[in-house]
Amino acid sequence: MGYSSSSRIGLCLFLFFTFALLSSARISLSFSENEMTVVPERSLMVSTNDYSDPTANGRHDPPRGGRGRRR
């Protein structure tokens, strides 16, 4: 056949990456806040809501009066 070496390499790379993409397509990476994902071998509970609502820092007390702190 009249295929060049570069077209064979390109075809091999295309097939390799297509196979890699299709074989990993069953793995879902997008999760809602709390979602249970079941894979035939194992199950995994994912929680992306790790932090509470933002509040002011109760321990922060800025210096009073003047331009800055005295040492």
From Swiss-Prot:
The modification Sulfotyrosine is found at residue 51. The keyword Cell membrane does not apply. Disulfide bonds: none annotated. Glycans are attached at residue 63. GO terms for molecular function: growth factor activity. It is found in: Secreted. Keywords: Glycoprotein, Growth factor, Hydroxylation, Secreted, Signal, Sulfation. It comes from the Eukaryota. GO terms for cellular component: extracellular region. The sulfation and the glycosylation are required for full activity. Residues 1-25 form the signal peptide. The modification 4-hydroxyproline is found at residue 63. Residues 47-71 are annotated as: Disordered. InterPro entries: PSY (IPR034430). The keyword Isomerase does not apply. Residues 26-49, 66-71 form a propeptide. PANTHER family: PROTEIN PSY1 (PTHR37177), PROTEIN PSY3 (PTHR37177:SF3). Belongs to the sulfated-peptide plant hormone family. Promotes cellular proliferation and expansion. This is Protein PSY3.
